[in-house]
A protein has these predicted regions:
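Membrane-proximal intracellular helices of multi-pass ion channels
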Residues: 1-299
């Protein structure tokens, strides 16, 4: 019994992290649930997994209620391995319950592809007969997957690989603390940058002529995957403003969120312009863009 209690205490922050992720997934599922209610679609396919995710999250958080120490390498590594299956299993449930993907393997693949922000899909979300709730849920899954990458980058990964954390601290002047409240603060900072870039992309798509729903879903997918799973979506419209909005959004998605937060926190845009990483990123874009333009002019 004592050995079990010791092992449980050694994993308390792991359970707290897993519980937080499950609770976020549960809350996120209420967004397509509300949208489906509004448009008189099958809303229960989102309500059931939402309740399950929140119950699971509360249970995990209860297991980690006694966290009063630093996260260890074992917890960090275990979280980075198991958080993706957790997200994928919870994310696949609306596809199975709706009947659009009856085979659980297909639904799991669709969910994994979304949360890992690959931009790959076995469904055509541009179809007119696709449920709005599922289109929205696919975009949210992509967006949450990108957010999870940022949270791991800014909170967990520096504790698993000390050199990585020291490199970020030295170059970006951001201090990463393994204490839970500091981890939560880093996560909030990453979320703030990610949400702000998504809002900017949404406004760009809106200005390009998309309706609010399409602008929102495209912004979430573009920012998370640095592209779109539906190239035909843009080809069918043949709109230069829309393509420009997508291109700018893709460039925004490639920015370092930690650097963006540092510039915002210090109110210094010049700080970003002096960053070597951003200079290399902009230079690579300009050179490759010039080469592509030159090749197109030749043909």
């Amino acid at each position: 019994m004592i050995k079990f209690q010791r092992r449980k205490r050694q994993l308390d922050i792991f359970w707290l992290l897993m519980g937080s992720v499950a609770e976020i997934m549960g809350l996120a599922l209420f967004v397509p649930f509300a949208d489906s209610l509004l448009w008189h679609e099958e809303s229960w396919i989102f309500l059931v997994p939402a309740v399950l995710a929140i119950a699971l999250g509360l249970s995990f958080s209860w297991l980690g209620r006694d966290h009063k120490r630093q996260i260890n390498v074992w917890e960090g590594a275990l979280f980075m391995v198991l958080v993706w299956p957790l997200l994928s299993i919870l994310g696949m449930m609306p596809y199975v319950l709706s009947g659009i993907l009856v085979n659980p393997v297909d639904a799991f693949f669709e969910s994994v592809a979304a949360v890992t922000t690959t931009g790959v899909s076995c469904l055509d979300y541009a179809r007119g007969d696709m449920m709005r709730g599922l289109v929205l849920w696919h975009s949210i899954l992509n967006w949450l997957g990108g957010l999870n990458f940022i949270i791991i980058l800014s909170t967990v990964l520096p504790q698993v690989s000390g050199c990585f954390g020291l490199t970020l601290s030295a170059r970006q002047s951001i201090f990463f603390s393994p204490v839970w409240n500091k981890m939560a603060e880093s996560a909030r900072q990453g979320f703030g940058v990610y949400a702000s870039l998504t809002a900017l992309s949404f406004l760009l798509y809106l200005a390009a002529g998309l309706d609010p729903f399409s602008a929102l879903t495209q912004a979430m997918v573009t920012l998370s995957s640095s592209g779109s799973a539906e190239p035909g979506y843009f080809l069918a419209r043949d709109s230069i403003p829309l393509e420009l909005a997508a291109g700018i959004s893709m460039l925004l998605s490639g920015l370092n969120p930690l650097l963006c937060w540092k510039a915002w926190d210090r109110l210094s845009f010049r700080l970003m312009l002096r960053d070597t990483e951003l200079q290399a990123y902009a230079g690579l874009f300009l050179v490759s863009g010039a080469l592509v333009a030159w090749n197109l002019c030749r043909t």
